[in-house]
């Protein structure tokens, strides 16, 4: 699969394999807002039919741990959300507040509207076959605990033979044992803990040297299982959906400059600010991920994905947009972040 290319092709005719996209950034026509492409639909219902087709195709290619960003107009995005909710699980919605946007009404139809200087976006994740939200972790949780289970059960039996956790805490004055054998959160007794337990065995007439040897053997098995667990944990971190951390402290309303000093270089009616686009990409994907752009437009998403070390594949039916996006991405070099 060739990456970092803009195809002169309708997105619905793409040849991408299923579940290949780690991040999809869809900035589709808004319907009769701006640009010739916004006025090509017979009516609003015809437009919504296209939204449904785009949504289905995005659902097909979105990875199981992937994220979808869907841009829209403040009047129309609610209708798109109803459709998108059928195919994805909604994570959040956001508002780009244009801090240098227009401050007055520009048409008669806005006479009874508040001045709008925002654009909206929805953020989705994949939905399971049964419709509920299922992360990578949920169906695989048992794999993380399975290796430890014999040790955990052995430890529970040992504690029970000493009178139970309550008696152990009472006699050792150590609350460490209170959650020591839960399924998802526990750790093996360290040498100090074992020395606390041995007198309890002695009080019951048990050979403490034999028990010390048993604990040492079990500890070695625990360390062996822990190595395997850490390996699985690293694999899980690589596969799970990226957490939307505090890299840029983004909130649901994002005040942001339109960056006209940068975007004016590209003759296209609908352009997003490069810096905001880059911050969303970094927040919702990892380096090396594949970003799919169904509507390339001026190429903002393509260029910024490349700048931060992601691969991209983009589509547009406008030959002029394809050339613009291709040239724009080609001019960008990956700019790795300096370690701090």
Task: Name what the model sees in each region.
Residues 1-315, 320-322:
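Core catalytic lobe of class I
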């Amino acid at each position: 699969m060739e990456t970092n290319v803009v195809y002169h092709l309708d997105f619905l005719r793409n040849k991408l394999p299923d579940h290949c996209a780690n991040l999809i950034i869809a900035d589709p026509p808004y319907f009769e807002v701006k640009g010739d492409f916004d006025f090509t639909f017979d009516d609003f219902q015809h437009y919504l039919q296209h939204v449904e087709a785009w949504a289905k195709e995005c659902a097909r290619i979105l990875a199981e741990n992937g994220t979808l960003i869907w841009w829209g107009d403040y009047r129309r995005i609610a209708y798109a959300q109803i459709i998108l909710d059928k195919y994805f699980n909604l994570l959040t919605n956001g508002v780009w507040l244009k801090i240098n946007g227009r401050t007055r009404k520009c048409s008669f139809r806005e006479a009874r509207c508040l001045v709008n200087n925002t654009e909206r976006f929805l953020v989705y994740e994949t939905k399971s076959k049964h419709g509920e939200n299922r992360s990578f972790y949920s169906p695989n949780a048992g794999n993380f605990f399975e290796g430890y289970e014999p040790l955990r059960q052995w430890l529970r039996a040992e504690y029970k033979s000493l009178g139970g956790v309550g008696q152990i805490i009472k006699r050792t004055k150590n609350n460490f044992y209170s959650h020591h054998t839960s399924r998802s959160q526990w750790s093996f007794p360290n040498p100090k803990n074992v020395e606390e337990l041995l007198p309890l065995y002695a009080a019951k007439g048990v050979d403490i040297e034999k028990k010390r040897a048993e604990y040492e053997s079990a500890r070695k098995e625990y360390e062996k299982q822990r190595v395997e667990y850490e390996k699985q944990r690293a694999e899980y971190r690589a596969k799970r959906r990226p957490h939307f951390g505090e890299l840029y402290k983004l909130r649901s309303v994002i005040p942001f400059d339109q960056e006209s000093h940068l975007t004016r270089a590209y003759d296209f009616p609908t352009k997003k600010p490069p810096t905001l686009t880059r911050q969303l990409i970094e927040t919702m994907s990892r380096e090396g991920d594949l970003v799919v752009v169904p509507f390339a437009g001026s190429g903002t998403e393509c260029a910024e994905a490349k700048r931060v070390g992601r691969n991209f594949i983009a589509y547009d039916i406008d030959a002029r947009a394809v050339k613009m996006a291709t040239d724009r991405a080609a001019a960008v070099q990956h700019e790795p972040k300096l370690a701090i």
